[in-house]
Amino acid sequence: RRARYKKEPVSLTLALLLGGLTMGGIAAGVGTGTTALVATQQFQQLQAAIHDDLKEVEKSITNLEKSLTSLSEVVLQNRRGLDLLFLKEGGLCAALKEECCFYADHTGLVRDSMAKLRERLSQRQKLFESQQGWFEGLFNKSPWFTTLISTVMGPLIILLLILLFGPCILNRLVQFIKDRISVVQALVLTQQYHQLKTIGD
């Protein structure tokens, strides 16, 4: 009876220790999963916002290029009209007695740059979609479900591992403690035996 009474606090202590570790592991898993999910979602939101902003900048620059082209056509048309009016004087520049200015059209460069930007945006979008894992792609339409699965999966794996390997580890630990207790008992008995032997001699 005494040996059993001594073992119960050890078993109770081990059970409390493993239970505490399990709950701590679950809490850590929930915290880690939630933090990783929030950080990933924030990164994806930032990436999507940058992508949208770049699209808007591209549209704005394209519209400015079209406006500049239209304005340059108006200016050139006015110049031709003024040259016709001042034809007798040798044209507008001769009438003003100034050096003539000529229009250099660089809107083709802007058009090319915008085409390259559109192409890079398209490539980034395809790359972003291809880098999404099957898990994110599967649950991309319902973020609450992704959050739930990501948060619960870590603790469930920890619990499964504890259920699989916990009994084996607990048995090994109990056996180790039993062996140590047996060694201590043997040492105590041999110590008492030596004392009795010296008293009896």
UniProtKB/Swiss-Prot annotation:
Cytoplasmic membrane side: 170-201
Residues annotated as transmembrane: 149-169
GO CC terms, sorted: host cell plasma membrane; membrane; viral envelope; virion membrane
CDD domains: HTLV-1-like_HR1-HR2
Domain of life: Viruses
Lipidation (S-palmitoyl cysteine): 168
Residue(s) at site: Cleavage: 7-8, 187-188
All ranges on the Extracellular side of the membrane: 1-148
Any coiled-coil regions, as ranges: 39-75
Positions of short motif CX6CC: 93-101
Region feature Fusion peptide, mapped onto this chain: 10-30
Disulphide-bonded residues: none
Record function comment: The surface protein (SU) attaches the virus to the host cell by binding to its receptor. This interaction triggers the refolding of the transmembrane protein (TM) and is thought to activate its fusogenic potential by unmasking its fusion peptide. Fusion occurs at the host cell plasma membrane. The transmembrane protein (TM) acts as a class I viral fusion protein. Under the current model, the protein has at least 3 conformational states: pre-fusion native state, pre-hairpin intermediate state, and post-fusion hairpin state. During viral and target cell membrane fusion, the coiled coil regions (heptad repeats) assume a trimer-of-hairpins structure, positioning the fusion peptide in close proximity to the C-terminal region of the ectodomain. The formation of this structure appears to drive apposition and subsequent fusion of viral and target cell membranes.
Domain commentary: The YXXL motif is involved in determining the exact site of viral release at the surface of infected mononuclear cells and promotes endocytosis.
Self-association state and partner proteins as the record states: The mature envelope protein (Env) consists of a trimer of SU-TM heterodimers attached by a labile interchain disulfide bond.
Database matches in PANTHER family: BC035947 PROTEIN-RELATED, VIRAL ENVELOPE PROTEIN
Official protein name in the record: Envelope glycoprotein
Organism expressing this protein natively: Kirsten murine leukemia virus
